[in-house]
């Protein structure tokens, strides 16, 4: 397949999207169990006004078309319920040159390290996405460390860690509670792990979602920590100094340089909005 290049003010560039949620049939089935009056996954998608994916393969086909439409060469897919490695694995099997993947891992579930080894070997995932505030655990928990130790044994592995404000619009739209705990949201909690496992790459999405200063401090100290640009960046309203989003980019680039700031769209559902 020929390489896709997007026309930009800086010329033709190869674009990769580091943050795409893969809302699979399993994702909507899981929501349906929390929303009994929706009856099933199709009922959930109707309430949300989204298209209902018929299979992981069909969803992968649609995402590949979306990448083509926007001249994006590759995307990092995120399996957005715990352990949904089969869905993203099916996407990678169908389009190995277009997709890589991480999956939501909850270290408090049984045998998370064994699940991760299996996911890397069988579903070809590249790593995990941790949501400490969602699942109520500390990044200092030994079970988290066990997962990072697994990743350290695999070249080019990575872990996304959601820090800062966590607000899921689809849960609000469905009237579902979001009992998150922001005590576990500080990027500073990554410092010891990132320092101890220099071969594992850590990604803090959304510029730290309100913890920009802390995210920059950790990334400045640890060369294996990256930030991504995903989301609407509504967290900027929490900045104590009036800074535009352009100013945020300049600040991050001044500290990290361009190679450790990843473009992410935070795309998730169909139909997409241009």
Which residues make up each language-model segment?
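Mid-domain alpha/beta scaffold segments of enzyme catalytic cores
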Residues: 1-146, 150, 213, 230
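Residue-level preference for alpha-helix termini and adjacent loops
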Residues: 14, 98, 224-225, 268
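Generic intrinsically disordered, low-complexity segments enriched for polar/acidic and small residues
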Residues: 16-20, 96, 246, 260, ...
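Active-site environment of divalent metal-dependent phosphoester hydrolases
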Residues: 23-25, 82-84, 108-111, 165-169, ...
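Alpha-helix capping and helix-coil boundary motifs
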Residues: 55-59, 111-112, 240-244, 257, ...
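Catalytic pocket-lining loop regions of alpha/beta-barrel enzymes
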Residues: 126-127, 140-262
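His/Asp/Glu-enriched, well-ordered alpha-helical/loop segment
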Residues: 258-274
């Amino acid at each position: 397949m020929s390489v896709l290049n997007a026309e930009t003010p800086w010329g033709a560039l190869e674009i990769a999207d580091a943050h795409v949620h893969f809302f699979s049939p399993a994702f909507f089935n899981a929501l349906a169990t929390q929303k009994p009056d929706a009856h099933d996954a199709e009922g959930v998608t109707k309430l949300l006004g989204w298209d209902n994916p018929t299979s992981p393969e069909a969803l992968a086909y649609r995402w590949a078309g979306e990448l083509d439409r926007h001249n994006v060469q590759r995307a990092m897919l995120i399996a957005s319920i715990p352990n949904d490695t089969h869905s993203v694995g099916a996407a990678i099997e169908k389009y190995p040159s277009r997709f890589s993947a991480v999956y939501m891992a909850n270290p408090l579930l049984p045998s998370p390290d064994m699940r991760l080894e299996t996911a890397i070997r069988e579903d070809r995932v590249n790593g995990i996405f941790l949501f400490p505030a969602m699942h109520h655990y500390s990044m200092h928990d030994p079970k988290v460390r066990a997962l990072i130790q697994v990743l350290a044994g695999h070249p080019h592995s990575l872990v996304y860690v959601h820090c800062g404000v966590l607000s899921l619009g689809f849960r609000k739209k469905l009237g579902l509670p979001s009992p998150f705990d922001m005590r576990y949201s500080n990027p500073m909690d990554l410092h010891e792990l990132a320092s101890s496992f220099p071969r594992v790459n850590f990604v803090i999405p959304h510029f730290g979602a309100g913890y920009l200063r802390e995210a920059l401090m950790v990334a400045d100290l640890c060369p294996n920590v990256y930030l991504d640009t995903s989301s609407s960046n509504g967290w900027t309203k929490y900045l104590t100094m009036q800074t535009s989003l352009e100013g945020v980019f300049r600040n991050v680039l001044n500290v990290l340089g361009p190679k450790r700031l990843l473009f992410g769209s935070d795309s998730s559902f169909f139909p997409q909005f241009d």
